[in-house]
Amino acid sequence: DALENYIPEFKGQDYGKVTVRQVLTMTSGIAWNEDYEDVNSDVAQMYQAPCQDTEAHILTYMKSLRFAHAPGTHWNYSTGETDLVGILIQKATGKSLAEYLSEKIWKPWGMEHCAYWLADECSNLNIGGSGLSASLRDYARLGTLMLKEGKLGDESIFSEEYIDNAKSLLYEVNDEGGGYGYLWWRNNNGSYAAVGIFGQMLYVDPAKNLVIAQIAAWPKAGSKELTQRRQAFIDAVQRVID
């Protein structure tokens, strides 16, 4: 389905023609700069505009963006599109992300601690691309939920279709065979991960029945050296399991 069917603000705009699947896979084709060190990049500017009534910051910013590629033909990471997924969920369910997460996952899965989710100052909608604050152990429990393919006893919290698309290699994005599924990074060994800036990570390896969660405060949004050290740690854990 096209985004304009769920987000009226996008009617008549390029983003209105983008499908939900294309947003979930970062293949909208919309021009976007995710350079965290460039103060003029899209990711740096997307929350800077003054509020327009109760419209979410990200909608105000992204309404004006235009296609750089035909939808579905080009992969490009965009934090803005993770925000759009959050808005889609809130508009479709009539609930905040925090309420929906609590109802569908946090309480049924027996999370140990309370968590909170930052809200957009203009719309009061939770921000899908960032702002979920939870304990390390509960992040690891989210990974365990993915490892169990969303199953809680005889019930499934996630649909089988979602799990398959989340952990599958839908788009190859590097020469090493790694790629992207539904908002998860897929590695060439079948493992997959949710990776945030400043060192946040949730790593799931079904073949080794392994979940690794990391909360960090790296000095830069992305660090090649620290990423390599983290990968060395993951490799070491896998060797011990073997």
Regions found by a protein language model. Name each.
Residues 22-25, 76, 113-117, 131-133, ...:
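Structural recognition of the beta-strand scaffold that forms the well-ordered cores
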Residues 2, 23, 61-62, 75-105, ...:
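Alpha-helical scaffold elements that line and support the substrate/ligand-binding pocket
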